[in-house]
């Protein structure tokens, strides 16, 4: 296939485009981006047919900061006939065999979502036709490729596939999380999504277990603390502002009225450090580096607020500097990952795991 289709948050197309251009160049794949502001997606069109398949396989989705989901796609299908939109789509997928799932989607914009009812109606007859053609298995198979049909306008769609081991498990790359009625703020969904995204389901029981000690810097009113408490952890909540009373009543939270940048934990056996402070991203990164160098935590999740321009460049520079600082201070065994999550706005979420080679214990 010739195109790589990348879903992103509307307004972040330039950042998504800058990132995929760099990553494709690293693999010596030539091409150019096609996108419009607030479309909610980016097209990377390769110069060589087949290069999109290579990108879809060799670029890890989780390594892309601003991409929620991606798939290798054919040329844009235009003016699909109202009487039969199924046949042209099936024909365009002639080279796809024995896929395990079909997703008929739209970009995450209000305009595109107006097509969602149509997409639902199309899914059943399209699924049946793809099964008859051999492009889709009779039963869903999570180990086989996923067929994507993304309508970007009425009668206009990109069609292609993603590989199941390098694809978001969620429709449109968006996890559907419920806001708990007793959570102090909607920011709680950011940490909930971060845990789901960065911690494999098979390891969550060990790495997010009850009884762990944690610290929340900039905790007020307690949106992130709520997620730690919900998982049975003990939390040192650091903020000059007030904490939600229902969290304090659990007996799991100790509130330190202090500046998060000056706080030193009285106990150093901290597994989780979390931080969502409205501050310059470089300053937050430096704080996380200091805690890591002091060995005060095992895993951290923190948000970096983004500038208005050159967001990909800024984040890349901060992450590269962080890796350099850690290594200069003798910390070579670490895992660093970053994602613009669905519940993030003008920010990205970073996960830092120290000494992953020793597993889930301090070492």
Swiss-Prot record:
S-adenosyl-L-methionine binds at residues 187, 220-223, 239, 259, 276. The active site is at residue 305. Keywords: Cytoplasm, Methyltransferase, rRNA processing, S-adenosyl-L-methionine, Transferase. GO terms for molecular function: S-adenosylmethionine-dependent methyltransferase activity. One of its GO terms (biological process) is methylation. InterPro entries: RlmM_FDX, RlmM_THUMP-like, RNA_MeTrfase_FtsJ_dom, rRNA_MeTrfase_M, SAM-dependent_MTases_sf. SUPFAM superfamilies: S-adenosyl-L-methionine-dependent methyltransferases. GO terms for cellular component: cytoplasm. Gene3D superfamilies: 3.30.2300.20, 3.30.70.2810, Vaccinia Virus protein VP39. It is found in: Cytoplasm. Its EC number is 2.1.1.186. Its main location: cytoplasm. It comes from the Bacteria. It catalyses: cytidine(2498) in 23S rRNA + S-adenosyl-L-methionine = 2'-O-methylcytidine(2498) in 23S rRNA + S-adenosyl-L-homocysteine + H(+). Belongs to the class I-like SAM-binding methyltransferase superfamily. RNA methyltransferase RlmE family. RlmM subfamily. Monomer. HAMAP family: 23SrRNA_methyltr_M. Catalyzes the 2'-O-methylation at nucleotide C2498 in 23S rRNA. This is Ribosomal RNA large subunit methyltransferase M. It comes from Shewanella loihica (strain ATCC BAA-1088 / PV-4). The gene is rlmM.
């Amino acid at each position: 296939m010739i195109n790589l289709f990348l879903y992103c948050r509307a307004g972040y197309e330039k950042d998504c485009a800058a990132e995929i251009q760099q990553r494709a160049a690293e693999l010596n794949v030539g091409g150019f981006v096609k996108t419009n502001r607030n479309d909610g997606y980016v097209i990377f069109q390769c110069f060589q047919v087949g290069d999109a398949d290579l990108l879809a396989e060799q670029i890890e989705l989780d390594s892309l900061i601003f991409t929620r989901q991606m798939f290798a796609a054919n040329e844009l299908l235009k003016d699909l006939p109202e009487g039969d939109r199924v046949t042209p789509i099936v024909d365009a997928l002639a080279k796809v065999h024995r896929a395990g799932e079909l997703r008929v989607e739209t970009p995450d914009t209000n305009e595109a979502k107006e097509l969602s009812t149509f997409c639902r109606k199309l899914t059943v007859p399209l699924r049946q036709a793809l099964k008859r053609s051999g492009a889709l298995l009779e039963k869903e198979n999570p180990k086989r490729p996923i067929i994507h049909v993304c309508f970007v306008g009425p009668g206009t769609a990109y069609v292609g596939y993603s590989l199941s081991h390098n694809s978001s498990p969620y429709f449109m790359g968006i996890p559907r999380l419920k806001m708990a009625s007793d959570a102090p703020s909607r920011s709680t969904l950011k940490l909930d999504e971060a845990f789901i995204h960065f911690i494999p389901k098979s390891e969550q029981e060990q790495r997010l277990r009850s009884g762990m000690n944690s610290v929340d810097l900039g905790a007020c009113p307690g949106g992130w603390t709520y997620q730690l408490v919900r998982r049975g952890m003990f939390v040192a909540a650091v903020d000059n502002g007030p904490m939600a009373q229902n969290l304090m009543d659990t007996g799991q939270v100790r509130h330190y009225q202090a500046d998060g940048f000056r706080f030193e934990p009285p106990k150093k056996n901290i597994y989780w450090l979390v931080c969502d402070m409205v501050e310059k991203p470089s300053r937050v990164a430096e704080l996380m580096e200091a805690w890591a160098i002091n060995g005060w935590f095992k895993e951290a999740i923190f948000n970096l607020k983004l500038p208005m321009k050159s967001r990909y460049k800024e984040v890349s520079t901060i992450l590269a500097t962080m890796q350099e600082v850690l290594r200069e201070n003798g910390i070579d065994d670490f895992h660093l990952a970053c994602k613009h999550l669905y519940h993030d706005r003008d920010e990205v979420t970073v996960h830092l795991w120290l000494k992953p080679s020793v597993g889930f214990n301090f070492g």
